[in-house]
């Protein structure tokens, strides 16, 4: 079978998914089934949150926006408009509670932009979102400077790295540009050294009381340093680097990027010729001044592990015009694709679709087709999860404690069918909207 035929089949599968998702009542019925509510340890898995980009309507809007951009005569924008109307009603009823990318205003704004046909429509909604950001983000930045750091202060999921990547779309808007500068200055300050238990450490140190779970609080009594793209310093690296590449610069920005990138390299673990990264470096490991003695990481994914870290290194290398960093990122991505570990889902966050988007991003950043064959392999892995008897086509798979991976019926961008669909479209046709901004790409 010729590749063109395969491509048409894969795109048609995404279109069929989009047709099935068009019935909102059916979506709610499926995602809210009892079996979808699980926990990993003390962390509950959230199958649906209507206003959240991670698990709700904004991601669905992105899918229809992207489909319309590729197939403008097929009516996908009409379905997207219906969903955006539902989303606006949900906001009116429940309000906005966070400016973040994956739970709040920035993600909603980005979804509206993806449907807007290059700002032709929905400018009123986008303006309202931006006004909300202009009101809330400065208050948060002031609060951050008055206490110890939380991951959700700076990360892409809940923090200002995600918001900043949204603001990069508004270079001509003075208010949004000024807000972006304030965030960049905060991220630079985050790299200044602080004193913890008599030890000088980087300012992105997360104290014990600000860990996500009680288990982590007990495991890291002196705190730690997060190394994942979703919650760690690769996120700020990506944002600071993207801004620099776009010509947006604040004092200390280059030094901040370099300091964080060097930290990633210093606390990597070498196995033969490949580098690995744990999700977390403990305070004690930092004190010893060396990487951990044993490779101990959870997976090779967008959220944690080699792919996300390598994306950050390549972005840093391009921003700093440092070919060594670019080469380290590219080479270790190659090693990763030849030996992917801990991945058993087709999704974005910790699945094959997320890896695929990073490979595409690195190709675009470098202007080289480093991963042409590897992208075909990743796409084949994603399609191997397609279930023609499942209404949304692709399950999310999660590994519960003591269990094998179980299929879950998720729809959202991070862990659901929408993220798989958008990823496949990008790998087949390229991206015509800005949905990948959510991933720091």
Curated annotation (Swiss-Prot):
Q: Where are the transmembrane segments?
A: none
Gene3D superfamilies reported for this sequence: 1.50.10.20
GO terms for biological process?
A: peptide modification
Instruction: Check the record and name the SMART domains matching this protein.
Output: LANC_like
- A Pfam family (short name) is LANC_like
**Per its UniProt record, what CDD domains does this chain match?**
LanC
Could you name the domain of life of the organism this protein comes from?
Bacteria
The protein's job, in short, is:
Could be implicated in the processing or the export process of the subtilin lantibiotic.
Say which family it is in: To S.epidermidis EpiC and L.lactis NisC.
- What is the protein name given in its UniProt record? Subtilin biosynthesis protein SpaC
**Gene name, Swiss-Prot/TrEMBL:** spaC
């Amino acid at each position: 079978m010729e590749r063109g035929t395969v491509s048409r089949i894969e795109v048609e599968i995404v279109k069929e998914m989009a047709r099935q998702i068009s019935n909102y009542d059916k979506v709610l019925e499926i995602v809210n089934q009892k079996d979808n509510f699980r926990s990993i340890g003390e962390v509950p898995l959230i199958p649906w949150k209507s206003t959240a980009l991670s698990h709700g309507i904004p991601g669905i809007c992105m899918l229809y926006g992207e489909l319309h951009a590729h197939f403008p005569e097929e009516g996908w924008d009409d379905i997207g408009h219906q969903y955006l109307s539902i989303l606006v009603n949900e906001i009116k009823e429940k309000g906005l509670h966070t400016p973040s990318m994956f739970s709040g205003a920035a993600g909603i704004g980005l979804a509206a932009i993806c449907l807007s046909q290059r700002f032709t429509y929905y400018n009123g909604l986008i303006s309202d979102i931006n006004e909300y950001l202009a009101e809330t983000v400065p208050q948060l930045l002031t609060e951050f400077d008055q206490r110890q750091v939380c991951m959700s202060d700076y990360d892409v999921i809940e923090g200002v790295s995600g918001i900043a990547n949204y603001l990069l779309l508004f270079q001509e808007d003075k208010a949004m540009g000024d807000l972006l500068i304030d965030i960049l200055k905060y991220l630079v300050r985050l790299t200044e050294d602080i004193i913890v238990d008599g030890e000088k450490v980087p300012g992105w140190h997360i104290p014990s009381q600000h860990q996500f779970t009680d288990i982590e609080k007990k495991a890291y009594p002196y705190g730690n340093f997060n190394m994942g793209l979703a919650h760690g310093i690769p996120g700020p690296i990506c944002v600071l680097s993207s801004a620099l590449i776009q010509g947006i610069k604040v004092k200390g920005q280059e030094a901040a990027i370099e300091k964080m990138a060097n930290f990633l390299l210093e606390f990597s673990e070498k196995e033969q010729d490949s580098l690995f990264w744990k999700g977390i470096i403990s305070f004690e490991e930092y004190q010893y001044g060396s990487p951990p003695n044993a490779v101990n990481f959870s997976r090779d994914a967008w959220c944690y592990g080699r792919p996300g870290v390598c994306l950050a290194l390549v972005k840093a290398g391009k921003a700093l015009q440092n070919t060594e960093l670019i080469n380290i990122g590219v080479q270790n991505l190659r090693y990763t694709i030849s030996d992917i570990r801990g991945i058993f889902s087709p999704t974005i966050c910790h699945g094959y679709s997320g890896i695929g988007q990073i490979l595409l991003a690195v190709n675009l950043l470098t202007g080289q087709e480093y991963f042409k064959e590897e992208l075909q392999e990743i796409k084949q892995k994603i399609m191997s999860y397609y279930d023609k008897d499942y209404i949304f086509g692709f399950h999310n798979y999660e590994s519960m404690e003591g269990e094998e991976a179980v299929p879950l019926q998720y729809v959202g961008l991070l862990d659901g069918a929408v993220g798989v669909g958008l990823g496949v479209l990008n790998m087949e046709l390229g991206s015509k909207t800005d949905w990948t901004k959510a991933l720091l790409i």
